[in-house]
């Protein structure tokens, strides 16, 4: 059945009553997902690193905009909790970097299978936190944040949270 993912068309097939010869079964019956989890680790680390780069860009734009956008006669950096929002974004980016570094090191030292707990943790945490940071940057920009004048809306579209229930189980 066709589906639309982002701006690309994909095809999803489903099979009923399929028989797989015993010699073609990987790891054992019902363990196919397990082998894919082990092999997907490096790609997940890469995706998390790219997402953190988007959060870094959003923070950069947020800091710049908070000093130039004026409301009630003051830069918005001096209003409300905007400085706290910026500070929290910096802290969360640093925490994400350390968590991804820990996951990557675990893959190098322990191997992909044993590192899967670390990889699953960053795969669940990073996209969610990155979306929150990009959203905060959009809020600080006002309507400009969702326009084509900044990369923020596009970054948010391409940083979708993963199916966390799978990563956390």
Model-derived regions, located:
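Single conserved hydrophobic/aromatic residue that forms the stacking wall/gate
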Residues: 1-6, 11, 158-169
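A short glycine-rich beta-alpha junction/loop motif
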Residues: 8, 12-22, 80-83
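Alpha-helical interface subdomain recognition
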Residues: 23, 30-33, 38-160, 164
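Intrinsically disordered, low-complexity acidic/polar segments
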Residues: 22-25, 168
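Residue-level marker of intrinsically disordered, low-complexity segments enriched
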Residues: 3-5, 11, 16, 33, ...
